[in-house]
Amino acid sequence: MTQPIKVLFIDDEQLILSALRRTLRREGFELFFTTDPFEVAKLVGEHRIDIVVSDHMMPQMTGVDVLALVRRLHPHTTRIMMTGQADRDATIRAINEGCIHRFIEKPWDDTMLKNVLHEAERSINVQRANAQPDPAQAVKTFHRTIMRDASGTIVLDAK
């Protein structure tokens, strides 16, 4: 069984975050929300967020800046920008700088939003399935599995 995809939404408007929560609560994602773009790096690192969806126009920081930071710290995280401000230049800049994978315009269409997130989910699950095991973890597992007892007998741990 695959683990649920973790999605973080950043928007300075609490009403938008509440609407997103209602729209997506039954989609099988583990959802996180914040109005503070300065919390994003901490949340992405602590919770191993798979997808970050950021509003563009926020008082403290733009969505492009938030998603560029996520890209720098966690390059494999899928990044999506969502905005009601059809700022074509910012969108082009974000795409050209590789900050975003998708752009969603507000007001969003619920079905389209769900489809975008499920498409990202499928891509993430394929990446997980194809991922090479972490070498450090493989060594730890190997050492737990094969041990030598005091008499020199090799003991294989069934775990």
Q: What are these model-predicted stretches?
A:
Residues 58:
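Receiver (REC) domain active-site loop signature in two-component systems and cognate sites
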Residues 2, 14-33:
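Two-component/phosphorelay signaling modules centered on CheY-like receiver
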Residues 11, 55, 83:
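Active-site residues of response regulator receiver
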Residues 5, 35-36, 62-65:
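Acidic catalytic/metal-coordinating carboxylates
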Residues 122-159:
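CheY-like receiver
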Residues 33-51:
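Acidic, metal-coordinating helix/loop segments flanking the phosphotransfer/catalytic sites
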Residues 107-117, 121:
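C-terminal output helix
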Residues 42, 64-78, 93:
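Short amphipathic alpha-helix used as the core "switch/output" element in two-component signaling
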